Regions:
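Nucleotide phosphate-binding site architecture
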Residues: 10, 46, 85
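Non-catalytic, surface-exposed connector residues within folded enzymatic/regulatory domains
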Residues: 3, 25, 36-39, 78
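Arg/Lys-rich, positively charged N-terminal/basic patches that mediate binding to nucleic acids
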Residues: 1-27
């Protein structure tokens, strides 16, 4: 699986605490191997028409992504649970 990172995702990632960055990288490796691994809690977001999905970094942080084609995904944003879902409403 290939992951493409939005510029906004990269900016958000750089601002995260070191422990969250490490956890996010670990979850990304799991995601590449098995996008529906139980630890990721992969879910399609509402409204479903936006085709946005989330995976869990930990209890507080999420990564929002969109499926592209040919086993490629686009990581759009990373942040705290409440903020990230408000963010997706603007997409």
């Amino acid at each position: 699986m290939e992951i493409i990172y939005a510029d906004e995702f990269v900016k958000q990632f750089k601002r995260l605490p070191k422990s969250i960055k490490q956890r996010a990288l670990k979850q990304e490796l799991i995601f590449k191997e098995n996008p529906i691994h139980p630890s990721l809690n992969t879910e399609k977001l509402i409204p479903r028409s936006k085709e946005l999905w989330s995976i869990r970094v930990d209890r507080k942080y999420r990564i929002i992504f969109r499926h592209l084609e040919n086993r490629t995904v686009y990581f759009l944003a990373i942040g705290e649970h409440d903020w990230i879902y408000k963010y997706t409403n603007r997409l």
